[in-house]
Structures are given as C-alpha cells and as structure tokens.
C-alpha cells in the first residue's frame, strides 16, 4: 500500500502549473445447483455496509480562486456494481453530472481510470468496493500530476517521455521475405513487459519520479525501454542504452519498489530497470 504522507497528500498540482492545496476537508443468482456450503459462502455477511460514502477530490479550473475540496457522496451498494468505477459512474449519472473522470474499457485494459483510491494508485475498474467497513472510500487523482479537472490528470509529459524512448521496432536489416521471426524463447523474454497499459500508476507512486520527473523517465517508461532492448527483432539496443547513459534518466531509481507493489497488472518495473542497469554496467 502506498501511503501518501499528510505533508504530501495536499500537494496535487493543477493543469495551470500552480500547486493546489486540499482544504481539510443487485444481482440475483440461481441456487438450484449449489451445495449448502456454496450457498452459505455466497451469502453476504450481516456486517456488510449497505450504504457507502465516497469522498472525492474536486477541483474546477473554471474557478481558479476556489481551492480543491473533498466532496462526499452516499451510494446504496445494493443498487451499484462491485467496483469503484461503478460507483463513480453512478454518482455522475444520478447525483452529480459535473464530476469528471476518465474511463473507457472497464476491464483493466485501457488504463484510463487510473487514480489514487484509499492511498493506493490503481484502476477504478479493478478496485472492488470494500463492503466490510463503514469508512468512506477516498478517491484522489494520481499524485504529483498536473490536474485538468477533478480526477483527470494531465498525461502530456508522461506520453512525451514515452515517445522519447522510440517505443517501436527498429531494425536496418529487415528480412528479405515475410516478417521478422522470433523463437519461443526470445518471445518469452517479453512477458511481463508488453502487458503494460501505460496507466502511470507505477510512475506516480515513485518518490524519485515525484521530485525529478522533468529528467527521470520513471518506472513505466523505463520498463518499456527495456521491452525494446530485450526484443530479439530490434537491432538498436546499444543505441537505446546510450540514450539512458546519464545521471538522471535511469539512475534516479533507488529501488523503492512502490512501482511493483502498485501495478494493477501485476508487472515488475523495478526488475526491468535492474536489467537495464546490469546490462549497462557490463557493457
């Protein structure tokens, strides 16, 4: 779990590059084929909370003089889907159409709904609502990002960094006929990297990225850099390493491992970064 210290939590930057400080602020199922044990397991505990509060970060760029606040909404969980994104959609559709957030696939594939939920960077579509506690769900945008509105971070700089590593196959000697061939063993080397959906949960959980994101590429981009270095079809591995040979782009990683703990896809950016360091040290 990524706990954001009180001294850091209020410091979420707005899209105009000015720091913004937070003010204190039913589905039915058939049981005809179920065993008694299965039926008992499927019953909701009596302690389950039927109504849940969601405290959500709000900031409107059209009202620049108004400080960001936490706004609380109450949701009947019996009339809401199981995920935090379901609650956000319900709030927007039924309670407050001004609430702004990104979402698309609802299946953990696009990365659009990345946000900080109860102190952890994750995807709202994959985060289940905790029904066993009456504590409100606290939802913030990804930390230390410029905010466009409410839960929508400005991803411009993140994508610019991603573009800088040239995330595509580079080879000056294409095959005379057909496609590039790759052995199963070489293909397996890409597992755990190509699945990255660029949600930025890992990068925005990294203290080194918080303080050096103008120069340090961050876990997500560095893992993607290694994805292309490790690809047997790419012939620009040395060139890619050379571009990282400076004091900031790569070496600001201090192996804190927040990136690995928070990745909603279960990937290991820290491992990829360590591979880059090892290869560059042995070159």
From Swiss-Prot:
Its main location: mitochondrion. Pfam families: Fer2_3, Fer4_17. [4Fe-4S] cluster binds at residues 196, 199, 202, 263. Binds 1 [2Fe-2S] cluster. Binds 1 [3Fe-4S] cluster. One of its GO terms (cellular component) is mitochondrial inner membrane. [2Fe-2S] cluster binds at residues 105, 110, 113, 125. InterPro entries: 2Fe-2S_ferredoxin-like_sf (IPR036010), 2Fe-2S_ferredoxin-type (IPR001041), 2Fe2S_fd_BS (IPR006058), 4Fe4S_Fe-S-bd (IPR017896), 4Fe4S_Fe_S_CS (IPR017900), Beta-grasp_dom_sf (IPR012675), Helical_ferredxn (IPR009051), SDH/FRD_Iron-Sulfur (IPR050573). The keyword Mitochondrion applies. It catalyses: a quinone + succinate = fumarate + a quinol. Its cofactor is [2Fe-2S] cluster; [3Fe-4S] cluster; [4Fe-4S] cluster. Residues 66-145 form the 2Fe-2S ferredoxin-type domain. It is an enzyme of class 1 (oxidoreductase). [3Fe-4S] cluster binds at residues 206, 253, 259. Pathway: Carbohydrate metabolism; tricarboxylic acid cycle; fumarate from succinate (eukaryal route): step 1/1. Keywords: 2Fe-2S, 3Fe-4S, 4Fe-4S, Electron transport, Iron, Iron-sulfur, Membrane, Metal-binding, Mitochondrion, Mitochondrion inner membrane, Oxidoreductase, Transit peptide, Transport, Tricarboxylic acid cycle. Residues 186-216 form the 4Fe-4S ferredoxin-type domain. A ubiquinone binds at residue 211. PANTHER family: SUCCINATE DEHYDROGENASE [UBIQUINONE] IRON-SULFUR SUBUNIT, MITOCHONDRIAL (PTHR11921:SF29), SUCCINATE DEHYDROGENASE IRON-SULFUR PROTEIN (PTHR11921). Belongs to the succinate dehydrogenase/fumarate reductase iron-sulfur protein family. Component of complex II composed of four subunits: a flavoprotein (FP), an iron-sulfur protein (IP), and a cytochrome b composed of a large and a small subunit. This is Succinate dehydrogenase [ubiquinone] iron-sulfur subunit, mitochondrial. It comes from Uromyces fabae (Rust fungus).
């Amino acid at each position: 779990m990524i706990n954001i210290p009180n001294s850091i939590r209020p410091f979420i930057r707005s899209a105009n590059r000015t720091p913004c400080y937070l003010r204190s602020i039913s589905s039915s199922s058939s049981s005809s084929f179920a065993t008694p044990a299965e039926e008992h397991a499927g019953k909701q505990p009596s302690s389950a909370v039927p109504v849940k509060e969601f405290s959500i970060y709000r900031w409107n760029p059209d009202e620049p003089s108004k400080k960001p606040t936490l706004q609380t909404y109450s949701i009947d969980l019996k009339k809401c889907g199981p995920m935090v994104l379901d609650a956000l959609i319900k709030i927007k559709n039924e309670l407050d159409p001004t609430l702004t957030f990104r979402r698309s696939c609802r299946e953990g594939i696009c990365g659009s709904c990345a946000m900080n939920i109860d102190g952890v960077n994750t995807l709202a579509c994959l985060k289940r609502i905790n029904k066993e506690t009456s504590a409100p769900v606290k939802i913030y945008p990804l930390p230390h990002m410029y905010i466009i509105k409410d839960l929508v971070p400005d991803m411009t700089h993140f994508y610019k960094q991603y573009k800088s590593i040239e995330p595509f196959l580079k080879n000056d000697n294409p095959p005379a006929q057909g496609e590039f061939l790759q052995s199963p063993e070489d293909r397996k080397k890409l597992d755990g990297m190509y699945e990255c959906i660029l949600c930025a949960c890992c990068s925005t959980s990294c203290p080194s990225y918080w303080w050096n994101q103008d120069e340090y590429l961050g876990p997500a981009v560095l893992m993607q850099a290694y994805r292309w270095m490790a690809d047997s079809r790419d012939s620009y591995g040395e060139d890619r390493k050379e571009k990282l040979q400076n004091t900031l782009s790569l070496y600001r990683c201090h192996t804190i491992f927040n990136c690995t703990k928070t990745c909603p896809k279960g990937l290991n950016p820290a491992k990829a970064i360590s591979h880059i360091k090892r290869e560059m040290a042995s070159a």
